[in-house]
């Protein structure tokens, strides 16, 4: 079975609450997490040290040992291509 294109292969936290993502299709995209930070579930990400600790587990970006995650489909659909 083919891996869906929206599966995250790598994440590199950037400045200004953005994430540089590489997806299963090999494309790099930039996601701005700023709008999420007002939601109570994502408020811990306001701490820069927490935000910068993003990692990929089973194709999903997570923080705090999986306490916080963002659906990979959302990341793909709401990010912009990076040249």
Which residues fall in each region the model found?
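Motif-centric detector for short Cys/His coordination patterns
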Residues: 1-83
């Amino acid at each position: 079975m083919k891996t869906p294109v929206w599966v995250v292969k790598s994440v590199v936290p950037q400045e200004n609450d953005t994430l540089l993502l590489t997806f299963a299709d090999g494309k790099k995209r930039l996601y701005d997490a700023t709008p999420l930070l007002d939601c109570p579930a994502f408020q811990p990400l306001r701490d820069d040290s927490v935000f910068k600790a993003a990692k990929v587990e089973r194709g999903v970006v997570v923080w705090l040992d999986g306490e916080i995650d963002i659906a990979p489909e959302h990341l793909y659909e709401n990010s912009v291509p990076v040249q």
